[in-house]
């Protein structure tokens, strides 16, 4: 596959969508420069938005060994489309849209890992792909792994080779961002790797292609309690009206070029141009002899049907695109502060997210990703939080230890049914964590929340196990299987 070359208009049409940087009110000073992002997907194409004017793809690896390089000259397959769209949505520079449809991390470099085998994606190949990223993290300085796909089996993390690989990647300093899935309308929760406790699982929302935040509504992402008892997703990002590339070298690519030329033409040009482009645009034979108004009506109807927003882009939907948008925010955060750990990044993302007040909390986690605020907090985060520091309460020497992180808080307390919901103050230690401990209350299931600055009650950002609090929110849950009081 050789990158496509172009010498024609890249103009958007009247169905154009809001570019992602504008949609998220992102800080344009941060572009992901100096950050390497790995994408695990079905397949890829060396799209001009990734390789022009400079090829930013550092490496390509095919787990199945079907395609040795992106420019090996093999046929363009349907499964190349998905990975091309996800990688461009996050890191594309908008070359084929004159910069309009660029990702937030449009100066990041990429490592592309294909995990499909003749179009099929198996659990073993996904795990192999993650392990390859771990093994090559130092060689390419990989900081982020985006996974916009999933396995087939709904199993606990401890029994999933995919989840185990994802958790291992995080232990090695790689931020893992995963799509939640698109089956929430059927009441389904996330499965591997989106159920993995330490990954950042991303659900979706729609702003109906409007900049007014009041238009936000949730997408039908997978949500709820997983087989391990954790609640996913942690955050949501745009999952509708996202500009993504049409795959070069395909029939639809040629057709949309022709249709876009027709849409951009003046009325007096349309009849002659319709005759010239009849085959390429797949126009009905009788349309060629119609007047300009009829031709234009047909062309615009087809562009709308195909979701074409510019000559080489269409709008897409799904958490497959919400995840790379969050990945691009993470790239900006790491550019702003390269010392950030996966634990710190996840903590910042959930603590800066904005909940949609009209939607159920369990479907959106901590809410809508706030790109600008996350980068601001990343700039000033002085602490390198390890994974342990951002995990659920744990038992040490017969005492239950609670940990919370918020550099802007002036006071933090914990309250739960283990202490009749009385506020127990936490103290800030030298590593930037608020901590306290209590005598282990015995075996059982306990609910709790943190209270920040005496007013804000929030669930534990480091604990995925939650339960409804009966007032529209969630309590965090800790389960103690052993009665430590008798040890």
Which stretches of residues belong to each language-model region?
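Aromatic-rich carbohydrate-binding modules that target alpha-glucans
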Residues: 391-445, 451-481
């Amino acid at each position: 596959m050789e990158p496509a070359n172009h010498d024609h208009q890249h103009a958007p049409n009247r169905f154009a969508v809001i570019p992602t940087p504008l949609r998220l009110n992102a800080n344009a000073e941060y572009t992901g420069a100096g950050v390497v992002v790995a994408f695990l997907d079905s397949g890829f194409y060396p799209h001009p938005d990734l390789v022009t004017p400079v090829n930013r793809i550092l490496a390509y690896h095919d787990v199945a060994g079907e395609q040795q390089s992106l420019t090996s000259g093999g046929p363009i397959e349907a499964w190349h489309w998905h990975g091309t769209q996800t990688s461009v949505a996050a890191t594309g520079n908008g070359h084929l849209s004159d910069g309009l449809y660029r990702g937030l991390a449009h100066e990041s470099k990429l490592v592309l890992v294909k995990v499909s085998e003749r179009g099929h994606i198996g659990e073993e190949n996904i795990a192999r792909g993650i392990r390859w990223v771990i093994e090559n993290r130092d060689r390419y300085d990989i900081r982020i792994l985006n996974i916009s796909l999933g396995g087939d089996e709904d199993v606990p993390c401890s029994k999933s080779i995919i989840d185990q690989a994802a958790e291992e990647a995080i232990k090695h300093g790689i931020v893992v961002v995963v799509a939640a899935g698109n089956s929430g309308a059927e009441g389904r929760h996330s499965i591997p790797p989106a159920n993995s406790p330490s990954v950042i699982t991303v659900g979706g929302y729609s702003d109906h292609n409007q900049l007014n935040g009041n238009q936000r509504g949730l997408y039908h992402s997978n949500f709820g309690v997983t087989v391990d008892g954790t609640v996913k997703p942690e955050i949501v990002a745009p999952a509708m009206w996202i500009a993504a590339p049409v795959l070069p070298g395909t029939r639809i690519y040629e057709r949309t070029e022709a249709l876009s030329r027709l849409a951009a033409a003046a009325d007096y040009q349309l009849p002659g141009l319709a005759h010239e482009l009849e085959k390429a645009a797949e126009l009905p034979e009788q349309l060629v002899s119609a007047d300009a108004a009829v031709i234009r009506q047909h062309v615009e109807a087809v562009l709308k049907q195909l979701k074409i927003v510019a000559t080489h882009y269409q709008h897409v939907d799904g958490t497959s695109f919400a995840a790379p948008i969050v990945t691009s925010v993470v790239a900006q955060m790491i550019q702003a502060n390269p010392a950030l750990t996966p634990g710190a990044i996840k903590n910042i993302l959930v603590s800066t997210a904005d909940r949609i007040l009209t939607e159920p909390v369990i479907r959106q986690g901590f809410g809508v990703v706030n790109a600008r605020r996350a980068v601001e907090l990343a700039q000033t985060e002085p602490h390198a939080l390890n994974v342990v520091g951002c995990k659920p309460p744990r038992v040490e020497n017969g005492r239950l230890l609670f940990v919370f992180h918020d550099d802007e808080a002036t006071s933090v307390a914990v309250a739960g049914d283990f202490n009749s919901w009385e506020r127990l103050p936490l103290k800030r230690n030298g590593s930037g964590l608020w901590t306290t401990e209590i005598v282990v209350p015995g075996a059982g299931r306990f609910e709790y929340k943190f209270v920040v600055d005496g007013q804000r009650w929030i669930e534990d950002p480091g604990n995925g196990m939650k339960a409804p609090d009966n007032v529209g929110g969630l309590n965090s849950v800790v389960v103690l299987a052993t009665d430590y009081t008798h040890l």
